[in-house]
Amino acid sequence: MYAGHAALATLAKGARPRVPIGLLVPVAFAPDWIQWVFDAMGRGNREISHSLVSVAMGATLVALLYLLATRQRVDAAAVWLTYASHWPADYITGLKPTWPGGPTVGLHLYTRPFLEFCVEAIVIIVCWFVYRRSLPVAARHRTVGLLIPIGLIAMQIAFLAATNPSFRN
């Protein structure tokens, strides 16, 4: 999942408006960024970034840091869930490690790009509706608000086109 991670951050923002979106988006993408850093160092290992164990540890770390900084338990739980949402979201679209030495599992919808796009678009739209409900009434119906789901869906199309030649055909 690509744009869906950002959408899940907007879902968390909609549920917990006090938590900054500028924190939630990086938290939602954290396993990918950890993977890219290790890949750049020539030490790529998806168990370090994407296993259930590493996702649980990363989610716990960022949630504890947020709790220490804010003393807001429910908001810290939202931060934890945002990080942890990465694994089930990626389970839908790809293949993910469970634990070191454990099986790799997933629905691997990347092999079916149109279906993957449809699932991701649904995630984006549902998350946007939750986020939109958190806005002041006057702001909910502004056209500019549509830029969030449109932009995320456009990002997903670009991602699929760049990574899957059959999607372009």
Descriptions of predicted regions:
Residues 1-169:
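N-terminal membrane-targeting hydrophobic helices
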